[in-house]
Amino acid sequence: MITSRTVSSLEKIFHDSEPTCASLSEMSMLGNERASFQLAYFSDEDTQCGISVSGWKPENIKIYKVVEINSDLPAFEDSDFYFLRKTPGLYPDMLEPVEDNSFFAESGHHGSLWIELDASGESAGRHDIFITVSKGKETVTNVITVDVINAKLPEQELMCTMWFHCDCLATYYKVDVFSEEHWNIIENYVRNAANHGVNFILTPLFTPPLDTEVGGERPTVQLVDVKKTKDGYEFGFDKLDRWIDMCRRCGIKYFEMSHLFTQWGAEHAPKIVAEVDGEKKRIFGWETDADSEEYRDFLHRFAAALTACLLYTSDAADE
């Protein structure tokens, strides 16, 4: 047997606890908005289930399974009381795309599907959305009414950024950094971020020195090419230009340049790789004091070159 009901996207469905939240029967959205809700389900046996959504244009529907991930430290000892749980365990977090309208329901587990609707191209008015879960000959259908308001959400005025770590994408998908495959993956993620309200992107001039163990390194993701010469440094901005063009194409308007000093005190330089005598070498990093004469000289030269690049890029975009 399988049971299901629609609930708010703000709810958290834990596998070991029956949800006590209210069901969601109605919601509204503007004519160019995206909105989401969840289908909470429970199965008394391991089974492959079918899922179908009707009453909305298929191309404007995305369905994900909410996957729990392990958290060893959900909260610090001195945290406040505004937590659903504080114990180590599994927490609903990752959205895994449902393929072939099918998902696996674990025996005795509560779970949820995340359903995203895009109102683009939908007519104004009330729409009854039918969500059907099938298990063999057994089917369960839930209905939620979506009111599409005859107005459009104005362009976002807030500057919204989320730290975007493209080294993680290279690691997860096992591709070379800034290979064509990596660029394609980055663009897909940037476009998805822009579609969900992000208009400000972390831009890795050099490998961002963020969330990195002291003395450790993240995989190198450096958009600026650096060459050390007898007279100082030469800088290449081809990858940065490509990054900016790609982000603008995806809907990004603002660029947050990666930090020029390490996190938690700004005591050191970030990892910077340069061509030295024909070889790629790390020339700055944890061993470099932030206020060292050599790094200050580098920043002085780099700032001038970067400013000229960005001014040119801005003028070209205006034309």
Segments (PLM) and residue ranges:
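Solvent-exposed, conformationally flexible loop/turn segments
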Residues: 27-34, 44, 106-110, 124-125
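Short, solvent-exposed loop/turn segments enriched in Ser/Thr/Gly
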Residues: 21, 32-38, 122-130
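Conserved small/polar residues in nucleotide/adenosyl-binding loops
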Residues: 312-319
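Aromatic- and acidic-residue-enriched carbohydrate-binding clefts of CAZyme catalytic domains
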Residues: 78-94, 164-168, 209-250, 266-301
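An acidic-aromatic substrate-binding cleft motif
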Residues: 142-215, 248, 253
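Surface-exposed binding patches on compact interaction domains or structured appendages
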Residues: 2-21, 45-115
